[in-house]
Amino acid sequence: MSSKPQSIGVIGAPFSKGQPRGGVEEGPTVLRKAGLLEKLKELECDVKDYGDLSFADNLDDSPFQIVKNPRCVGKASEKLADVVAEVKKTGRISLVLGGDHSLAIGSISGHARVHPDLCVIWVDAHTDINTPLTTKTGNLHGQPVSFLLKELKEKMPEVPGFYWVAPCISAKDIVYIGLRDVDPGEHYILKTLGIKYFSMTEVDKLGIGKVMEETFSYLLGRKKRPIHLSFDVDGLDPSFTPATGTPVQGGLTYREGLYITEEIYKTGLLSGLDIMEVNPSLGKTPEEVTRTVNTTVAITMACFGVAREGNHKPIDYLSPPK
């Protein structure tokens, strides 16, 4: 496959306060060190690097009920939303390098300011749809979708730090792929709101080809619209991405991860991308960190056109040498 070069705006979001484990704030650094931006440029993408955001460490951040670090997390997403919106106004695809998945509140909010008709494909072992009232852990990286859904607006308490958030997607605008660790309250929300999901059971039953076909038919069947892919590396099996905060056995294979992203690229509709929850501190060995980072880079590259069948430039490779 070859097509016109894509323009990308890369935003590093070194933030960890949506969950308890240190190290996830190093995600952008290790992905940059692995040469991600250079590889995108080799693909002839037009890459603009917006650098890494800096996040204030709000010392006076007492919990809201059991919700931890609400002001820090809310402020970080607010800052990210502004930068993503800025990137989208230039017509670039926003590429957010996390950081923990609470940042999706900001990434999707900012994207929706410019493209309110967007749809979301959420690849993850978890639904991240607990509300501040259903959460058992209080970690905000397990709650971003609840802040984004219009249908949950009335069920959400006023959490300090989140006054700026306006729900921007409906239940019918999101599809989950890779689920295998869903809390009872989350399962209730999925079922009550009729949210479309493909847990690992459906992936096993249907195969990833059918899963993507059904995903596109569901989200794009009536009208082509911008896609926001929010990719938590724990959606993949921990044999491929061990260095992450909440790994769950029995996940998507390397091949399934590539298939998902290759197919999204082929639609030509990818408009925003989050690459979340790479935590180099949680690799048991340096090799586990390298494996996680290399897998994550490969998944990201597939979003921008690297295909397993190969790629070529639009020239005649068989023309006789001059």
From Swiss-Prot:
Protein biosynthesis recorded as keyword: no
Protein EC: 3.5.3.1
Pfam entry (one): Arginase
Enzymatic reactions: L-arginine + H2O = urea + L-ornithine
Subunit-structure text: Homotrimer. Interacts with CMTM6.
Family assignment from sequence similarity: Belongs to the arginase family.
Protein name stated in the entry: Arginase-1
Organism: Bos taurus
Gene: ARG1
